[in-house]
A protein has these predicted regions:
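Short secondary-structure boundary segments
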Residues: 218, 271-272
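Short metal-binding segments enriched for Cys and/or His
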Residues: 443-459
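Cys/His-rich microdomains that often coordinate metals
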Residues: 350, 420, 437, 446-449
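Short, non-ligating residues that shape and space the ligands of small metal-coordination modules
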Residues: 352, 422-426, 451-452
Length: 463
């Protein structure tokens, strides 16, 4: 990564903060949140962009330290269990941006209009340019195909603008005539614009109309573009055009789950202070209903936050205590169901997920919705209906076989059996119980390992 080499001191300082203990990070987050709130260019005019568990935790954390600002979300994109929490906390629901029919886009409409969000936001954007050639994007398309930039890019070669050869083989077909290649052309549109129309533009429009600036539950530990932006700009970024705060920038997944448990306690003590929004007055002010008590702030889609047994030798425990002033080590926190959530129709990075991937899990929780998303989103020129199933087939991701199918048990390695056993009850066919593991490809992680046949019988392990 060249960006970290060009900014070594910033990155070094940020990483040092990420390595601090939880107490330091929590106090640091509070300090940075207040600094943003009190900045003269912000002057307390803030809101919280709320989505899943991370930002729900942020909303409650800010309230717990005395920062009482509104929360907003395009809740219709979230799982129903997340919508339930949003409603009880008084999160303001925003609508997606308007589409061609002069009404808010639906999730299906944005895919039909623009294309499937697949691989990654960056790659999808490049594929979309190849699928929609114009004189204006000719230079960028050339860089995507060859890695060569024009005058604006300094006439460089072998730049990161070039799409990987693997995906050029699949999506570079529209440029075959120009470059004398024989790449494939995808039988579906690809786009990186779903997030923009469904989430980003509604939030930007709200920020502009309300003149408020966002707190966001972003963490550098999530990697990708977020990591780069947060490491270079820090928790608070204030410029002429952009003002935003990410108090959890230095948090890890363990930190956010630890804080979520603390915010659970805070909520249960203060739940009557949160009222659902029921409508608006003629002057635009909000109407509120009676408080709704939640049994937990953790949406059902995540399951519960639990701590796994400690897996350390005595020597490792002693070393840990020596490094942490005698503190006892604890097992890792995790959620028993989904670890991350997002739009049910989003396919970004699904190609690198272990199975069961997000669409597999949707099949278990909402079979009707799964059927629709996999098979009935778009129609091709022959009138045939298709959905994510066609896209996943094209990029080599399985989706039709089912972990719960006891007539077709899956070949799984020992590590994946142990991991899946935390979420499902795993069983072996009677004839496979006495068989020795054989070398093969693991259905879940895709690695060459010693594997045995297993299938799932319940969505949670039997107790």
């Amino acid at each position: 990564m060249k960006w970290d080499q060009n900014n070594p001191e910033k990155v070094k300082d940020f990483i040092a903060k990420m390595k601090q203990d939880y107490a330091f990070k929590k106090a640091y987050a509070a300090r940075r949140a207040w600094e943003f709130y009190n900045h003269p260019d912000v002057a307390g005019m803030c809101y919280v962009a709320v989505g899943g568990l991370d930002s729900i935790t942020l909303f409650l954390f800010l309230r717990s330290i005395g920062i009482e600002v509104p929360g907003t979300s395009v809740s219709m994109l979230e799982d129903r269990s997340i919508q339930k929490v949003h409603k009880a906390l008084g999160i303001r629901a925003l609508r997606p941006a308007n589409g061609p029919k002069d009404r808010p886009y639906t999730k299906i409409e944005v895919i039909r209009e623009h294309g499937f969000p697949v691989l990654s936001k960056e790659i999808a954007g490049k594929i979309s340019l190849l699928q929609h050639p114009s004189e204006k994007n000719a230079t960028v398309r050339h860089a995507i195909m060859t890695g060569e930039t024009g005058a604006y890019g300094g006439y460089r070669k072998n730049t990161r603008m070039k799409m990987s050869q693997k995906w050029l083989e699949k999506f570079g077909g529209p440029e075959n005539e120009k470059y004398g290649t024989n790449y494939q052309t995808a039988p579906f549109k690809v786009s990186d614009l779903c997030c923009y129309y469904l989430k980003e533009k509604p939030c930007n429009d709200y920020a502009r109309s309300s003149r408020r600036f966002p707190y966001m539950g972003l963490m550098a530990s999530e990697g990708g573009r977020r990591q780069k932006a947060l490491m270079l700009n820090g928790c608070n970024y204030i410029s002429k055009d952009t003002k935003r705060s990410a108090p959890f920038a230095i948090f890890t997944r363990q930190d956010i789950l630890t804080l979520a448990l603390e915010m659970e306690e805070y909520y249960q003590e203060h739940w009557q202070e949160f009222k659902p929004i029921t409508g608006e007055n003629e002057d635009g002010s909000l109407l509120y209903g009676d408080p709704i008590h939640l049994e937990t702030i953790v949406p059902e889609i995540y399951g519960e936050i639990v701590r796994d047994p400690l897996e350390m030798t005595e020597q490792e425990i002693d070393a840990y205590k020596a490094e942490h002033n005698g503190a006892e080590p604890e097992g890792q926190l995790r959620t028993t169901k989904a670890q991350r959530t997002g739009c049910s129709m989003c396919g970004f990075v699904v190609h690198i997920e272990s199975r069961p991937h997000r669409f597999d899990r949707l099949r278990y929780t909402s079979p009707g919705e799964w059927e629709m998303w996999m098979k009935h989103i778009c129609q091709d020129e022959n009138g045939e209906w298709y959905g994510w199933g066609r896209v996943l087939d094209y990029i080599g991701v399985g989706w039709e076989d089912d972990l719960f199918d006891d007539t077709a048990p899956k070949q799984l390695c020992e590590d994946c059996v142990a991991r899946l056993g935390k979420d499902f009850t795993m069983e072996q066919p009677a004839e496979a119980c006495n068989e020795k593991p054989e070398k093969g490809t693991c259905w879940s992680c895709g690695r060459k390992r010693c594997v045995s046949k297993y299938y799932a019988t319940e969505e949670e392990p039997a107790k």
